[in-house]
Amino acid sequence: MDNRLSFDYLPGTDIYLYQRRDMFRMNTDTALLGHFMRVRENDTVLDIGCNNGALLLYASRYTKGRLIGVDIQKEACELAEKNL
């Protein structure tokens, strides 16, 4: 595994994700947003500035709809894709 990556879990879930040590990382704000988000069963979720895809992973617990992540950093998009 790339030594820039860590393998962490999303608090309050049994979901794990990769995070880069040199990029923005999931934090308490992410966990709170993920916990309190309201997503219906077939909703499409768009996360602008998705970074590692953590919020999309939280959303995946609620919807069978599309999960779309957008980020300006190519590396962030690649990491989100790996996590999803």
Which stretches of residues belong to each language-model region?
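Class I SAM-dependent transferase core
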Residues: 2-40
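Conserved SAM/SAH cofactor-binding pocket of Class I
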Residues: 35-84
